[in-house]
């Protein structure tokens, strides 16, 4: 997805809802996240999925720490994500073309 | 007492509140660094030199201090060729897109190690003394350049002209913050701070900023201050080879705090300015010791039109800095027509430019002087701000926009403009999402909590102000889809989490109170519910309501909906209107279930404004002759709200006592309430009268409006109730009243008191005991006469006559007394009353820079004009983004 900084972006998103697991005292999700706008995007460990929103929180301009915090809030047991994927985008585009 | 016509406090008074004087407590500049004490932060600084090598230094700051950073802009020293001196190396192209971001995420003030090579050698000295600063301040450096995401990479080739103090930038970054304990890091170079021909900058006296809790730890905002101590200390950004320090940026901390070299932006702009203008006075003469000159205001404004975007951004940031707490500069900016320039920049394609422009506008919009606000409106500022809010994903920009709107909203002529352009956006973009309210609540998920973000606080403050603008404003807000629902949800969430003292809650309750004003007249379909007079329970007009234990009947909120079943019980003798579907929107304002919410707030909150507003809401809802008021009055009783209110009569705060007294007065339109109030509240009411007449200690004197409100309440409850009149006698009310009539300086107070006395005298049954106590008609009459007129009625249309329909009294209840609706208008950033109460923990102030107002506010004993709140500091130079990390970080969640 190319975008111009400062301009709105449209993307194909997928809604994902995850219920956190309880592990000891914590609620965990069970995966790792990488990136954040404070990170070097060229070295993102997981480049495939990008998260747009977490439980309503905008994730498009967050630092790594902020993203982590929003995913790991204790008060929320369910995390609803809006994720975008390159493959998703392509699939939709192809289906629209055909 | 203001007549009912305004249920709201007169805008005048509010306006004065709104426009906070530029007290030192107000912090306009956003550059506040606040960090939760004790939060360890880690800064990473990266410097990339043009040869592509990257140095990364990580510093761990274990102690966080509040950073107040002063920033002084210095010009780039010019070399003999008139171009800024660069210590070797090609100038960076800071203004090349994106190039800057890489390099300037200096965090933690990387020691000289992060300086690029050339400058390292120059042996510049770091400023002494700064305490460990939290990285945020350093982050500001990068902010200054306006680039957020660090990108590892070589410094791009700079513009050939090198006038952009690039090297300086680099230096600045590395130097600025003095991270961590000195021992903890190596500081190869120490810069020698020395004044460099810098005039003292006495522009603004930065107030001390105290961070607020709302400030996220990530958010570094360095407070930009310009202490008058002059620019003695500078952070020498780099050491120019040629001289002993061209300091490019002066970040001068007011106290031994680390300075963040915020001047990057300025630097660049200065550099460009320098190149363009060549006015550095001493450049030519003393190459060795370049003199710096800050750009003049017209120059800065001219830079706003500079073709190079970063220059624009930097100029705007510098402008914000200049305007901070400086009414003169703000005025001059307007006179020099700077405002249209800034408003135009709000639509600029580059985010950084927009952000900076908004920061400058925020500062400019703040203050007692309303001309700037008007000027901003005149050049289309409000729609531009709203556009920016819609488009912006960046939280900082949203905070700036909403903060500016809050500032503007305290100016009366702008309120409708803001409603016209911004109501929908503010509601849908901020209020609804942050409140946790969901339009179609998912049955499976539990209700979301409200997020008390700064953006929400600003927006709620803005809406609070505009909600006081009269009937049309109220109508618009009531009919704005989702607004009332979201506010209610947020308030319920606050009560549920026992977090009821913050500013956002205060704002929300005030909006609710304002919107509750005159609901019985203004909402669509109100006449359906009108009653001839507030009748006894159960005499309501409408048909029997099917009682259902269905939350949806009570508004469809998923909220902590335990009240459903309990609510039913309350209406066993009342007929509620038949509801075919859940109440939503403005209907929620007067559903009886709000009673519990307001009572919870009254019980739990320590915020006097919140208390006043909640009591005010109940007052508004209990007024009027419609069915809902009947239910509300009864519900308050059934929810055991009367004791809560009576207890608040003991409050030391005038406004709370006043609001509660008037609420009780309206509530006593319900007969059973009247009896109860007469029994249980009389002692407190009389105590207040006694305090009015003979204050127990100096300064405890109640205000006139409060006294009159209390007296009116007494009058209401002793009218048409012999028992209550007797209670008054038993509470020794008569001597207090007589003494008040005799001694009061206020005509209104005396009139009201004598009015009560006359009513008491009219009970023949009591004459006996009165005379036994030595009271004679003459004495009563003389008391009345002193009050100028036998029927001195505290309110228009004196009702001595108990045969007057209660309706009038209820109306009077609305009108008289201070406020029916307390618009609390001005308490926006311009009228921030949060902090003013001594008792009030100044939490609302939160975030960057506002804290500074706390101190003075605390000392302000006057309730009348709560010191204007700080407009949220506009610029947060430190990027909220975290550190620049060359290696990707991933976390397990």
UniProtKB/Swiss-Prot annotation, chain A:
GO terms under biological process: negative regulation of cell population proliferation; negative regulation of protein localization to cell surface; negative regulation of Wnt signaling pathway; Rho protein signal transduction; Wnt signaling pathway
Subcellular location field: Cytoplasm; Nucleus; Cell membrane
Membrane topology: Peripheral membrane protein
GO molecular function: beta-catenin binding
Keyword Acetylation: yes
KW Membrane (keyword) present: yes
Tissue: Detected in kidney distal convoluted tubules (at protein level).
InterPro entries: PDZ_sf
Gene Ontology cellular component terms for the protein in this record: cytoplasm; nucleus; plasma membrane
Modified residues (N-acetylserine): 2
Domain PDZ: 12-87
Main localization (coarse): cytoplasm
Keywords linked to the UniProt accession: Acetylation, Cell membrane, Cytoplasm, Membrane, Nucleus, Wnt signaling pathway
General function of this protein: May regulate a number of protein-protein interactions by competing for PDZ domain binding sites. Binds CTNNB1 and may thereby act as an inhibitor of the Wnt signaling pathway. Competes with LIN7A for KCNJ4 binding, and thereby promotes KCNJ4 internalization. May play a role in the Rho signaling pathway.
Subunit relationships: Interacts (via its PDZ domain) with GLS2. Interacts (via its PDZ domain) with RTKN (via the C-terminal region); this interaction facilitates Rho-mediated activation of the FOS serum response element (SRE). Interacts (via PDZ domain) with ARHGEF16. Interacts (via PDZ domain) with KCNJ4 (via C-terminus). Competes with LIN7A for KCNJ4 binding. Interacts (via its PDZ domain) with CTNNB1; this interaction inhibits the transcriptional activity of CTNNB1. Interacts with ADGRB2.
Protein name, as recorded: Tax1-binding protein 3
Organism: Rattus norvegicus (Rat)
């Amino acid at each position: 997805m190319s975008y111009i900084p400062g301009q709105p972006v449209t993307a194909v998103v997928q809604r994902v809802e995850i219920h956190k697991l309880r592990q000891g005292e914590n609620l965990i999700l069970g995966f790792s996240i990488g990136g954040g706008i404070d990170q070097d995007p060229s070295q993102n460990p997981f480049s495939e999925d990008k998260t747009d929103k977490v439980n309503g929180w905008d994730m498009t301009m967050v630092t790594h720490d902020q993203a982590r915090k929003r995913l790991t809030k204790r008060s929320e047991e369910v995390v609803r994500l809006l994720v975008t994927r390159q493959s998703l985008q392509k699939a939709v585009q192809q289906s629209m073309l055909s | 007492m203001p007549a009912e016509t305004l249920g709201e406090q007169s805008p005048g008074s509010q306006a004065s509140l709104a426009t906070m004087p530029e007290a030192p407590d107000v912090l306009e500049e956003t550059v506040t660094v606040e960090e939760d004490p004790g939060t360890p932060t880690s800064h990473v600084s990266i410097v990339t030199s043009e040869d592509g090598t990257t140095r990364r230094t990580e510093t761990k700051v274990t102690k966080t201090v509040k950073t107040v950073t002063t920033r002084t802009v210095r010009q780039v020293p010019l070399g003999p060729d008139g171009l800024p001196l660069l210590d070797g190396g090609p100038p960076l192209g800071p203004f090349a897109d994106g190039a800057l971001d890489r390099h300037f995420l200096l965090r933690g003030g990387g020691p000289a190690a992060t300086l690029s090579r050339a400058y390292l050698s120059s042996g510049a000295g770091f400023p002494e003394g700064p305490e460990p600063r939290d990285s945020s301040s350093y982050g500001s450096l990068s902010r200054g350049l306006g680039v957020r995401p660090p990108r590892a990479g070589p410094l791009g080739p700079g513009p050939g002209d090198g006038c952009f103090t690039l090297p300086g930038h680099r230096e600045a970054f590395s130097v600025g913050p003095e991270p961590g304990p000195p021992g903890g890091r190596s500081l190869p170079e120490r810069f020698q701070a020395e004044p460099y021909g810098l005039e003292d900058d006495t522009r603004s006296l930065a107030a001390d900023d105290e961070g607020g809790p709302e400030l996220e730890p990530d958010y570094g905002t360095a407070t930009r201050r310009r202490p008058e101590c002059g620019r003695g200390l500078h952070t020498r950004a780099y050491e120019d080879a040629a001289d002993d320090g061209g300091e490019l940026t002066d970040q001068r901390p007011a106290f031994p705090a680390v300075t963040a070299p915020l001047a990057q932006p300025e630097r660049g702009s200065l550099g460009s300015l320098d190149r363009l203008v060549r006015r550095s006075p001493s450049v030519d003469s003393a190459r060795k010791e370049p003199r710096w000159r800050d750009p003049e205001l017209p120059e800065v404004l001219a830079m706003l039109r500079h073709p190079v975007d970063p220059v624009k951004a930097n100029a705007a940031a510098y402008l914000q800095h200049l305007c901070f707490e400086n009414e003169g500069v703000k005025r001059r900016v307007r006179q020099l027509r700077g405002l249209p320039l800034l408003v135009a920049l709000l639509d600029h394609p580059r985010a950084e430019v927009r952000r900076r422009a908004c920061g400058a506008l925020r500062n400019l919009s703040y203050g007692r002087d309303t001309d700037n606000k008007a000027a901003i409106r005149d050049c289309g500022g409000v729609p531009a701000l709203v556009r920016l809010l819609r488009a912006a994903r960046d939280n900082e920009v949203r905070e700036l926009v909403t903060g500016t709107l809050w500032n503007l909203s305290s100016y009366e002529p702008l309120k409708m403009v803001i409603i016209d352009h911004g109501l929908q956006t503010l509601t849908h973009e901020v209020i609804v999402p942050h409140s946790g309210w969901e339009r179609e609540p998912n049955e499976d998920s539990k209700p979301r909590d409200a997020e008390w973000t700064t953006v929400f606080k600003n927006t709620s403050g803005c809406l609070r102000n505009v909600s006081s603008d009269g009937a049309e404003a109220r109508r618009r807000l009531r009919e704005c889809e989702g607004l009332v629902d979201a506010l209610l949800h947020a308030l319920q969430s606050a009560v549920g989490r026992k977090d009821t003292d913050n500013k956002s809650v205060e704002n929300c309750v005030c909006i609710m109170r304002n919107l509750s004003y005159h609901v019985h007249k203004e909402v669509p379909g109100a006449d359906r519910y009108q009653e001839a007079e507030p009748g006894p329970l159960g005499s309501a007009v409408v048909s029997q309501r099917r009682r259902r234990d269905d939350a949806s009947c009570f508004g469809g909120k998923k909220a902590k909906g335990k009240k459903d079943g309990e609510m039913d019980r309350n209406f066993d003798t009342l007929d509620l209107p038949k509801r075919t579907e859940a109440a939503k929107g403005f209907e929620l304002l007067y559903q009886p279930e709000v009673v519990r919410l307001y009572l919870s707030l009254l019980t739990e909150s320590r915020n006097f404004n919140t208390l006043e507003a909640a009591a005010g809401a109940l007052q508004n809802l209990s007024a009027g002759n419609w069915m809902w008021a009947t239910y509300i009055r009864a519900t308050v009783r059934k929810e055991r709200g009367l004791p809560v209110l009576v207890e608040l009569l003991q409050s030391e705060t005038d406004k709370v006592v006043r609001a509660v007294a008037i609420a009780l007065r309206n509530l006593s339109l319900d007969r059973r309430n009247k009896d109860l109030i007469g029994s249980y509240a009389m002692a407190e009411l009389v105590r207040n009268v006694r305090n009015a007449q003979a204050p127990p200690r100096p300064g405890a004197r109640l205000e006139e409006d409060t006294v009159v409100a209390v007296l009116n309440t007494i009058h209401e409850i002793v009218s048409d109730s012999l028992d209550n009149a007797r209670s008054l006698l038993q509470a020794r009310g008569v001597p207090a009243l007589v003494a008040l009539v005799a001694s009061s300086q206020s005509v209104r107070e005396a009139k009201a008191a004598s009015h009560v006395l006359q009513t008491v005298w009219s009970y023949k049954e009591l004459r006996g005991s009165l005379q036994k106590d030595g009271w004679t008609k003459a004495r009563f009459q003389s008391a009345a006469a002193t009050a100028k007129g036998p029927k001195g009625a505290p309110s228009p249309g004196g009702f001595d006559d108990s045969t007057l329909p209660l309706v009038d009294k209820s109306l009077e209840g609305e009108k008289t007394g201070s406020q029916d609706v307390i618009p609390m208008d001005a308490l926006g950033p311009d009228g921030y009353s949060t902090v003013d109460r001594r008792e009030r923990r100044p939490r609302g102030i939160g975030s960057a820079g506002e804290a500074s107002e706390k101190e003075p506010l605390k000392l302000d004993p006057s309730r009348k004009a709560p010191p204007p709140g700080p407009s949220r500091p506009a610029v947060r130079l430190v990027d909220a983004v975290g550190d620049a990390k060359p290696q990707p970080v991933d976390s397990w969640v």
